[in-house]
Amino acid sequence: MKIAILSRNRRLYSTRRLVEACTQRGHEVRVIDILKCYIDIASASPAIWYMGEKLEGFDAVIPRIGASVTHYGLAVIRQFEMMGVYCLTESIALGRSRDKLRALQLLSRKGIGLPKTSFAYNVYDARELIKLVGGTPLVLKLCEGTQGKGIVLAETQKAAESVIEAFRELRAEFLVQEFIKEANGSDVRCFVVGDKVVASMERTAQDGEFRSNLHRGGTAKVTKLSPTERRTAIKAAQTMGLKVAGVDLLRSSRGPLVMEVNSSPGLEGIESATGKDIAGLIVAYMEENAKPVTTTRAGKG
């Protein structure tokens, strides 16, 4: 197959591993910076141009779209879809997962376990938001944050009210969520490919930190999932319509709770912790499922 990897940095671990996996399995692969693409929107022959070259003949696309360029990345993916190219991550699925509020609404509708969450545009009484999630301590999350950025732990009522007021003054959209004490600073990353969890790891925050993201100094080790955790991760990915996803769970007294469904999960942490060839599993999935698409088909999920 001729495969395009949409990535702004070919030196990133995940991009390098996907290139290696494609090459080792005999595919032609190119890394394309989406910000250097420009789109020819025409009903007869939609096209994408890249640094003066018309992109043609691709069988499949692997989007690795950073959060900061989601809007333009979605436009490029949609254009590939209009051209009939198979996209591992569909535009609809990517858009759902990047909108944290929409993602939680979809997961809630499917009956998937979630932390108690409240959201508002302009609440004059912060105490009402706090009451909805069961009081303090609680977690406040900017809707646009990634990799643990834009997340604050408020341990007291006064602290929570102050942060809510600050976010409101900035006109920032944010979520208020209950703090799951029994998770003890750990979460579980489930890596889903297709309809299977192919790897899982437990991430633990460093001392003095409540966010377990590896980008923030957290550590990771292999963990065994319960059948319920496995089913929850798969159902969460399918709800978003994602064929490849990193589903983050908290282990709580009422069962697994989904924190986030990541549409562009990093490979370095999960491959290092588990020793598995995740990049190879992703390419193998594409080999079995990549088929030309039509512009009339609806996104899954």
Curated annotation (Swiss-Prot):
Belongs to the RimK family. Its EC number is 6.3.2.-. ATP binds at residues 141, 178-179, 187, 211-213. Mn(2+) 1 binds at residues 248, 260. This is Probable alpha-L-glutamate ligase. One of its GO terms (molecular function) is ATP binding. Mn(2+) 2 binds at residues 260, 262. GO terms for biological process: protein modification process; SOS response; translation. It comes from Cellvibrio japonicus (strain Ueda107) (Pseudomonas fluorescens subsp. cellulosa). Mg(2+) 1 binds at residues 248, 260. The keyword Glycosyltransferase does not apply. The gene is rimK. Keywords: ATP-binding, Ligase, Magnesium, Manganese, Metal-binding, Nucleotide-binding, Protein biosynthesis. It holds the Pfam family Rimk_N. Residues 104-287 form the ATP-grasp domain. It comes from the Bacteria. Mg(2+) 2 binds at residues 260, 262. Its cofactor is Mg(2+); Mn(2+). GO terms for cellular component: cytoplasm. Binds 2 magnesium or manganese ions per subunit.
